[in-house]
Amino acid sequence: MLRTLAESGRMGLAALSISGLWLAALPARADTLAKVPGAEVELIAGAVEGVQVDAGIEVRLAPGWKTYWRYPGDSGVPPALAFEGSQNVAGVSIAWPAPKRFSDGGGGFSIGYKGAVLFPLKVELADPGKPARLQIAFDFAVCEALCMPAKVDLSLVIDAAGGEDAARIAAARATVPAAQALGAVDTPSVRSVALDTAATPHRLVIEVKATNPKADLFAEGPDAHWALPLPQKTALPDGVARFVMPLDGVPSGVDPTGAPLTLTLVDGPKAITTTVPVPAP
């Protein structure tokens, strides 16, 4: 028995040594939660599927505070992230849940979120057979009466045995607008886009089909140099709404004809995104 116990002890020590070597190969778990004035931010991870890992950044805002979408509207700062310092991570992409329009207090409107928002991330591993650590630097802005920039550094060890937050990430991904073709018969949908050349500057007239009377539409240019205004809505019969948007905010010297615009239509809990070219005059 004593010999068996001794052997068991040596085997246990050997197992611990091997386990220790494996754990030493993994970076220590760093902070997954950070706080800034008006918000707290959490980095979470879900399931690992081959080289793909679901993750997310959740921003939980204090009452009366807001943060911004990828296109902030008339004012604001869009979120940005970097993953330098990550280990065994080849790439990270972010998805954007459907936003809302808010008054910015200065006569304009901003686009973003109140309460809480979880940005789904898709993480690509360089080698799925090796330990991985996700390091995220997240720059964003939070606003109450005034806006302030914020930055948090978050990290976590990606664990194939984890995934307890998979349901939260999946629920957030379900709120990301789905791609849809122009003129689709589904609801919601963007039915048509026309150019009104009688107006100065020219304006886009966009007809959409929606079920919610508070349905809203947002327009983005092909790159960050475009600063398009927010479309204004007129309700029409049979669940159709018309949005009008001056073709303003186009970069100097750029002919907008044919440029791809991204239209995001938010219809209550449903949202779609449609890419359309600017019509020719």
What are the residue ranges of the model-derived segments?
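Intrinsic disorder/low-complexity segments
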Residues: 5, 14-16, 186
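Extracellular/lumen-exposed scaffold segments
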Residues: 29-281
